[in-house]
Amino acid sequence: MGMNWYFVGVDLGQSHDFTAIAGLERAELTGEWDPVVFAWRKRIRLGLRYLERVPLGTPYPDVVERVVRVTRSPELAGRCHLIVDATGVGRPVVDLLRRARTECNLIPVIITGGEAEGISEGYHHVPKRDLIIGLQVLLQGAGLQIAAGLEHGPKLVTEMAEMRVKVTSAGHEQYGAWREGVHDDLVFAVALACWGARKVYPNAPSGENAHWRFEGATLLGY
């Protein structure tokens, strides 16, 4: 079995929106020998292991402290990536996280309404549609496990069901909850973590580790 890596996604809320923290585990599992391709079968398993919704009104320094505590979990030490929504108020929080010296590689993301990814001054610019569709593909293709017993697991499923795409008069797509008063913080925290896993590991390894497949049930325990 290869080393497991962890991806912590943080969607930062404002006065009327929750902040959400998601912890994703990427496990590389070795299966049986395949004589046809002359390689060991490998399985990449993505599992949502942690999901937290920070109470409304929590000051950003306290949010940073909470994120730091999560990243300093012994299981994550030296093998995690922290993907943070740096859109809007997120930049000052990213600066606080940098000064806090988390145990993770920090990847700030600015969520855009565009169509192409890019990077500028250390900030990744990622279309909202890429985050949402990427998560939907994983769920529909059984590529993401959601651990049973997560308090906010059912809320995540509800948020995904509430997501809609709206086409503006200019022909641009907008993704979000289809009615007011519905939150989407859990969806984006998980989507950021999943995006991070795909960004850091975009391709299957070559050579003797080239034979991969995804495994996982869409939901565990719900």
Model-derived segments and spans:
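RNase H-like, metal-dependent nuclease domains and their acidic two-metal-ion catalytic environment used
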Residues: 1-110, 117, 125, 129, ...
